[in-house]
Design a protein with these regions (language model features):
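Active-site substrate-binding loop specific to GH73 endo-beta-N-acetylglucosaminidase modules
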Residues: 129-137, 178-179, 189-192
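Sequence/structural signature of outer-membrane beta-barrel proteins
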Residues: 28-32, 65-69, 114-116, 135-137, ...
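Long, well-ordered mid-to-C-terminal structural blocks that present hydrophobic/aromatic surfaces
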Residues: 200-228
Length: 228
């Protein structure tokens, strides 16, 4: 039987002004009840700059990930929702968001965790490292934490209903190299990924329904790896 103890702590400092800068720090300590331990750290830095008299916002967020050891349990989905390879200044969000009274439009780099199937408890919840989309992310290399990709996103709200839709490059990236960066658009190689969600909120409860379509098919090996 696999056991894992995780200690979580969060620090959310923020500086409020016309331009908003904030940071979120999450740490986990893992122990397999034998002799193996692991210490994971995730720092997210956010910057929002209002433009066009507040009708639009330049959004930027980076991820900084550090851990002391490799995965201590031989399960390719693992037990942590933040565990990933060490990385510095991976782009989570970088683009322009325009706001109307009941709608938003974003163009730039983004990932699915920013907008879809999010609630108070799914913002930080211990489950698979495939993120909040374990089935989709296990089948396709989408822009799911810790990866991002070029995106066109919009949402429309009316009453308690909200419809969201995003169109992404079919593969997510988190590097700073020529062939590994979230600004790549390669539909012939990576495919195109679209996800839609209908959300209903009532009396503090949220109900979700969604559909996702990918233009490519990927073979997943027994270790969970997908060929590039």
């Amino acid at each position: 039987m696999k056991h894992l103890f995780i200690i979580l702590s969060c620090l959310l400092p923020s500086l409020c002004s016309v331009q908003t800068f904030s940071g979120e720090y999450t740490t986990e300590w893992q122990w397999d009840m034998k002799r193996n331990t692991n210490w994971l750290n995730l720092l997210r830095l956010n910057l929002n700059v209002p433009v066009f008299d507040g009708k639009g916002t330049i959004e930027a967020s980076t991820l900084h990930i550090a851990k002391t050891n490799e995965t201590i349990i031989a399960d390719w989905q693992t037990f942590s929702n933040i565990e990933a390879e060490n990385n510095v200044a991976a782009i989570a969000v970088l683009g322009y968001m325009h706001e109307w009274q009941a709608a938003h439009l974003f163009v730039g780099v983004r990932n699915v965790n920013e907008d879809f199937f999010t609630s108070d408890i799914t913002a930080l919840f211990i489950n698979s490292s495939c993120g909040i989309f374990p089935t989709i992310a296990a089948s396709y290399p989408i822009a799911n934490y810790p990866f991002s990709g070029l995106t066109v996103y919009f949402d429309v709200s009316r009453g308690g209903w909200t419809f969201r839709n995003s169109l992404y490059n079919g593969t997510g990236y988190n590097g700073w190299k020529r062939r590994d960066n979230p600004f790549l658009v390669r539909p012939a190689k990576d495919g195109v990924f679209n996800i839609s969600q209908l959300e209903y909120a009532h009396s503090g409860a949220h109900y979700f329904a969604g559909v996702a379509v990918h233009s490519r098919q990927y073979t997943v090996g027994p270790d969970g790896e997908m060929p590039s």
